[in-house]
Amino acid sequence: PDLPRHKGISILILDTREAGFSHTVIPTCSNPTAATYYDNVKVPADMLVGKLNGGWQLVTSQLNHERLGLGAWSDKVVGLFRRVFLWARARDENGRCAIDAPWVRSQLAECYARLEAMRLINFRIAADLEQGRMDVALASSTKVYGSESAIEILRKLSEIVGASGLVRAGSAAALLLGELEYEVRASVTLTFGGGTNEIQRGLIAQFGLGMPRAA
């Protein structure tokens, strides 16, 4: 109680078979997650991770790595972009291509530009990690830009393919085996995983721009 905030936290590994531990599944529009409960659970001291009272450093390090991973999600939509691009170039029964429309070319070009920008950011991050560096502001910036870019790219791809892109997998009418529809739903969770994008903008201001913390 006498330590400053965040300084008295320790991380322990818990065997989920221990008495008192339970969990419930929480379905979401993306992958399911879970809530965990600890009712008088006792954990042996030798299950300590790292140093005693050194847990907050582990938590923040994990969060930064999680943000980098979430920001890199835009790489996951590269495959969908390429498939939509090929679909747009293919001719229908009337000999027409979706890519003939100027607005489709414009949308595809913006998607490509965002993906290339994110790819360069990911290369920068990979180089930093190889050198043992972790920039808090860059991790948060990557998460914000990457997650919001993924949502925007998927939205544009959905506009290009039309109503068929909104049909779930398993239906004969599903375009691209329903992958685009699923990723559109799943991408929403990127904005709050690892800390909401609003929180990330505060971290960018604090650690990247040297601005004071919000009251």
Where do the model's predicted regions map?
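Alpha-helical interface subdomain recognition
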Residues: N64-A215
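FAD-binding core of flavoproteins
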Residues: P1-R89, E93, Q206, M211-A215
